[in-house]
């Protein structure tokens, strides 16, 4: 049997187990849909886990600054996948910590928008498609990650997780973040997307020698040099590249602690 298939099947099974565990243990769950490759895989896995239909809302915290292709993707597949789509706007930048660097401050609007959505809907669990290999701060995360009453993350106080034993009880008055693809890599995401024929936003594919490896707000996200015009070529490129996945994200190039400050305050 193809070893790649074995590996992807194992990843899929573990992620589906985590999704079902979260659904069984939490009363009011939602899946955060950023519209990027990772959260699209998350929706695909959730549809598989629950026999074709996602049984909890898909929450898009909208900055109003995404690429047009991302909004077109959301509108099409929100309907096609029959999602209970909740689109919640972010507040203006005036509501954000003014001591943050410019790009981080712009990105932090999502944190404030997420806090408003939590207050509005009362979710006790939020599923997010982050991965440990993306960024150093996310490498410190847990699969079931408790948040404080204001949505904050205490990086120094994370519960141990051994042998698939998870603490799936949210703190009083707070919520859990659930990360079912935390153990995946960027290459895993693309290999699975190819195998499952998951729809993608065309910005991920090269045009005129450029493509986006990571998608965010249009004003703080930039393409990288690439000739990869299909997923097979993306996978080959990833085997050789030394360029970080988030090289096109402006906030990752600001102060050394900017991203961790965002995540401690409740960012994804």
Question: Locations of the language-model features?
Answer:
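Nucleotide-activated chemistry modules centered on ATP-dependent adenylation/adenylyltransferase
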Residues: 1-268
């Amino acid at each position: 049997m193809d070893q790649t298939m074995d590996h992807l099947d194992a990843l899929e099974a573990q992620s589906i187990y985590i999704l079902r565990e979260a659904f069984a243990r939490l009363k009011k769950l939602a899946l955060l849909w950023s519209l990027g490759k990772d959260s699209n895989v998350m929706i695909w896995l959730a549809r598989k886990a629950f026999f074709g239909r996602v049984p909890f809302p898909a929450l898009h915290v909208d900055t109003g600054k995404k690429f047009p292709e991302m909004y077109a993707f959301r509108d099409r597949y929100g309907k096609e996948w029959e999602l209970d789509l909740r689109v919640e706007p972010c507040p203006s930048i005036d509501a954000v910590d003014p001591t943050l660097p410019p790009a981080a401050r712009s990105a932090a609007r999502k944190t404030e928008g997420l806090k408003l959505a939590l207050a509005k809907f009362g979710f006790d669990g939020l599923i997010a498609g982050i991965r440990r290999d993306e960024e150093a701060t996310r490498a410190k995360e847990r699969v079931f990650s408790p948040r404080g009453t204001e949505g904050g993350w205490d990086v120094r106080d994370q519960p141990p997780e051994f042998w698939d034993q998870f603490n799936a009880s949210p703190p009083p008055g707070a919520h859990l973040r659930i990360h079912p693809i935390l153990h995946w890599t960027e290459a895993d995401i693309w290999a699975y997307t190819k195998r499952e024929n998951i729809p993608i936003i065309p910005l991920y594919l090269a045009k005129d020698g450029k493509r986006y490896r990571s998608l965010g707000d249009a004003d703080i996200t930039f393409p990288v040099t690439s000739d990869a015009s299909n997923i097979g070529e993306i996978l080959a490129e990833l085997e050789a590249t030394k360029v970080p996945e988030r090289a096109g994200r402006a906030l990752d190039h600001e102060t050394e602690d900017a991203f961790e400050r965002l995540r401690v305050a409740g960012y994804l």
